[in-house]
Amino acid sequence: DGEQALQASLSVEEKLXIALCLEKTGVDIMEVGFPISSPGDFKSVQTISKKIKNSQICSLARCIEKDIDIAGEAMSVCDFFRIHIFLATSRLHMKSKLRKNFDEIIDMAIFSVKRALRYTDDVQFSCEDASRTTIDNLCRIVEKLINSGVKTINIPDTVGYSIPNELSFIIKNLFQRVPNIDKAVISVHCHDDLGMAVGNSISAIQAGARQIEGTINGIGERAGNTALEEVIMAIKVREKNLGVYTNINHKEIYRTSQMISRICNMPIPSNKAIVGSNAFSHSSGIHQDGVLKNRENYEIIDPVSIGLKNVQLNLTSRSGRAAVKYYMNEMGYKDSDYNIDELYSDFLKLADKKGQVFDYDLESLAFISKQQDELEYFCLKFFSVQSISNGLSTASVKLLCGKKVYTESSTTSNGPVDAIYQALNRITHFPITLQKFQLIAKGKGKDALGQVDILVEYKKRKFHGVGLATDIIESSAKAMINVLNNIWKAKQVNKKLKILKKK
């Protein structure tokens, strides 16, 4: 659901990296895609289904036979999975969107459930726009769905319209009025249009819901979804009051949040609860004094409990790979999370440039190296830029394309970044349009790493790229190379899928 907020679709590799992070964090179920929507989404669901072992895989489908069949096919590589089907139940959606009456809606829902049960005995059903559905209709369809074999009933506040006492009222009524309610798990799926997604989710827990749907950092369509890290920590901090617990590995929360922020190109607001950079900052003198005496005076959460560690790095170009590996382990990274040879090579280059390397530098390098595939088709071997005072620039690049090396110079351009991009385009001939360019400082001071995130459009599809270096122009060039490789990979996936369809 979170991907709907992104300007560019994630690649298969990026989705897998997120899935592995979520698995390590300990989420029970992850909804990994909508396989009917595109060949890329089908491939992502299939790939993740093969790799994830400790979390249950779930796939989304409409109440359409082909949707359900494709979802079942995509996940058939794993032993146990869930199909999540949905259909609107509110009067507004039935009248203006579906143009069907409630009896027809029930028939469609039951037929789809039976279809899904051919593939798995774990079916979840969402009554879309449930918070604006009459309670009588909601109770009626929920009872029939449970009788048909649905194990999880999801109550979505699809447009973020509900307030906590209203959603609590809906959940309580289901428990009071649906005779077979004990045979299913009640779930809620809240949106944040009125800023109440987390509050609504907590009120639903108090009313009896035992599954909460959400996204890390609250990423989602419009104003976003329930921020999982906020619900998780609310449950942990107020466990006695709420009477429930989770199986989450809390110490993975911060790193997962940071990783997803980077992959999705969505910076975390500094005042974001739990994971924002100011979440554990104290500027008031009174507060600072109180925290120094006892952190519990002004902190209800121990920063260490979510994975924040005060690791003091003192790494220079004289530090060995054992030291780099030690600090990565101290920050919570496992050996399988990064390639030590690649990371150490990048570390030495950075240390030679800026002297001392900090924890955030190492994390950024590890993230970028993880994004790079060993078999990248495009590789930037060399570039040079010349600029003059009126803002005009020219650039020369040497680009490895597969096994061939091409050299190209750009004509006069408006700035060094545009000059490099024009030179690269003269070699690749990809009809791309730059839509967004963003520079983020990773660290502090004049030697901070600069991360460039770009968004381009290629044949009506959007692609995201990221580059990291102490030099902004180099970061920009690397970001475009990342984009070009993502486009090339997408083209290869489409070719393979066309061949499979012919077979």
From Swiss-Prot:
Could you say which residues bind Mn(2+) here?
A: 1, 189, 191, 225
Q: List the disulfide bonds.
A: none
**Gene Ontology biological process:** L-leucine biosynthetic process
Which NCBIfam families does this entry report, sorted A to Z? Answer: leuA_bact, PRK00915.1-1, PRK00915.1-3
Region annotation (Regulatory domain) ranges: 379-503
Sorted alphabetically, the keyword list is: Amino-acid biosynthesis, Branched-chain amino acid biosynthesis, Cytoplasm, Leucine biosynthesis, Manganese, Metal-binding, Plasmid, Transferase
| Pathway assigned in UniProt | Amino-acid biosynthesis; L-leucine biosynthesis; L-leucine from 3-methyl-2-oxobutanoate: step 1/4
Q: Which family does it belong to?
A: Belongs to the alpha-IPM synthase/homocitrate synthase family. LeuA type 1 subfamily.
What reactions does this protein catalyze?
A: 3-methyl-2-oxobutanoate + acetyl-CoA + H2O = (2S)-2-isopropylmalate + CoA + H(+)
Function of the protein: Catalyzes the condensation of the acetyl group of acetyl-CoA with 3-methyl-2-oxobutanoate (2-ketoisovalerate) to form 3-carboxy-3-hydroxy-4-methylpentanoate (2-isopropylmalate).
Entry annotated with the keyword Isomerase: no
Cofactor(s) needed for function: Mn(2+)
User: Gene3D superfamilies attached here?
Assistant: 1.10.238.260, 3.30.160.270, Aldolase class I
Protein name (database record): 2-isopropylmalate synthase
Family annotation (InterPro entries): 2-IPM_HCS-like (IPR050073), 2-isopropylmalate_synth_dimer (IPR013709), AIPM/Hcit_synth_CS (IPR002034), Aldolase_TIM (IPR013785), LeuA/HCS_post-cat (IPR054691), LeuA_allosteric_dom_sf (IPR036230), LeuA_bact_synth (IPR005671), PYR_CT (IPR000891)
The gene designation is leuA
Source domain of life is: Bacteria
Q: Name one GO molecular function term.
A: metal ion binding
- Return the HAMAP family for the record: LeuA_type1
Q: How does it assemble?
A: Homodimer.
- The UniProt entry lists the main location of this chain as cytoplasm
Any idea of its EC number?
2.3.3.13
Q: Which GO terms describe its cellular component?
A: cytosol
CDD domains the record matches: DRE_TIM_IPMS
